[in-house]
């Protein structure tokens, strides 16, 4: 009997099935189909990821374009604002009779803000709240702070310029955000960029301006998510204002002492003094405002009395030269030609001006107070006054606004990193000494400065002050 060695069928010859763990079989076709399915799924994921990246890139490009628009507008506004302040200052210095109009300007400012200012009277605190929310800032805020700040300086009020500039930058950013229908996170980034462009353009310090936008709204936090936008905004605003002819004040540190134990001890003690000075400044403005509100119910009467008190202080202290920006004070501090009285008088007249409701800013007066105080300390301890005047500028500014990283960047902008180690010491010690106080009550306390202040975490500076007052009572 013959045997047939061939397979019973062709299908059996082609059977490549493999056993599965559960006893079943899978074929080559199953493998091919599964592979195709996996490739298709990967292609879909890649396509979705590509579309998402393109959308994000387009959104970032759109936001960056808006940042440039805001910064260009702010650069022009800063140039116009600084030019108006220079004109007002020159006129006042040559026409002393203009001081007589300070009460008129005070009452006019109070009336306009009361009846037509909407929420503009909240100033930079409104800018902070808008940056952390979505609230639109009406365009009239920029107009009002521009005009009223200029009139304050024209008639002799002692104030600065940063506050008005940040309000202008915040207003421009808020309105462009509204026109572009930005989402909350993009609105937030654009607002911080507007703040950065204002600071960089007004003070000629683009590095500090970039970090100021990221740091201003918070205590204990830097918002790096807006970092690139703040950097672009600050430099764009600065270069725009510079190109239009803005000139910035410059002070030079003549010599830097060696980092010896004695020098470090002097710097640490000075930093503590600077921090306490900033606390005194913020307390003075707040107290003057509170006293006027408590004892004078009519807002026009408050403005009138406030202006008359400022004029009386000028007359009694022979302090007419401290009116306006008084930028000469910083130069005198660097030259070692200031006394403790210079810092004290500037602090008093500025607190009386801002507490009475006049428009302006706080930073330039803080610079002058710090430089005058530092220069005096330098002469007292036998260290180059320009060195301690620079530390005083930075320390009082840092403690007053709660911005230590911005302060370090400003040291690079203004003094090219000279004495960097000393700058860092002053920035962080004055920041700690300043506590949860400052010129911006709306600042959010994200990370308390000390463990003992943990109860303030998550609240605002205003709430921390109120809590402290309740404990005292």
Q: Could you say what each language-model-derived stretch is?
A:
Residues 2-473:
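Alpha-helical transmembrane segments and immediately membrane-proximal extracytoplasmic
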